[in-house]
Structures are given as structure tokens and as C-alpha cells.
Amino acid sequence: NKGQVSSKLKRMIGFVSSRVTGCNYCQAHTIRAAERYGASDKQLENIWEFRESRDFSDKEKVALEFSIAASSIPNRVDENLSKELRKYWDDGEIIEMLGVISLFGFLNRWNDSMGTRIEEEADVSGKKYIKGWNPIKHKS
């Protein structure tokens, strides 16, 4: 929980990254952690409408956009996004966010490939906040 990027935002970045890669296990855990670290119900319920939402600052919006682009294959971080990102974040903060995205790149692949069994508390958060929640792969 150290660094310049808030713990709340790092968890939302992890959630967005996990959603892009499709790992239900990590989605549930990151949305639960974002809630614990202070994300509002409105932010969590509408995280995919962040671009138009007043519940996210411009700084948070570009961070979530970065998470989507950096988590995509092929990578979609382009010059325009890089310029927008640097309006709000310095190199250290960008590296911190990319560290979260990279960590979840590993965790998403590991937990999804292994079908890691989801814990009851994480399942509750998934049902509460994630539209289309279906962790069947992680229930056995």
C-alpha cells in the first residue's frame, strides 16, 4: 500500500485489468479490495461507465483507460493516451500503475488457468458489483 497512487485506485486498476483479461477470480477480489479501500458503491457499480461518470475524476479516468489499454493484447497504449496520462501522472506513478497491471497479468492467467476456487466473501462481492457475474470455472 505504499506509493503515490491511492490504494483505492490501484484496486480499481486491478479490477479493470482483470475484467479485460477475463479472470472472474481476480475481478471479485479486486472489486472487494477496492470497496475496502474506499471506492464508493456508485464507482463500483458503474466502473465500466467511468468515461461519462461524474463519480470518477479526470485523473482516475485516464488511469482506468491506461489499465484497459495496457491489459489488452495487443497492447493499445498509444501516443495520445501516453500524452493524456502524463497530464495527470508522473513517471513514478505511471510505473506504479503499470506494476499493478503487470502483477494482475500474471495473477489473472494463473488463477484462470488453474481454476482457483473462489472464496465465499469474494463471490458475494462479485454478485453485488459485477454485471453478468458467473464464476463457474472457480466453483469446483
In which residue ranges do the predicted regions lie?
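Hydrophobic alpha-helical segments
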Residues: 1-140
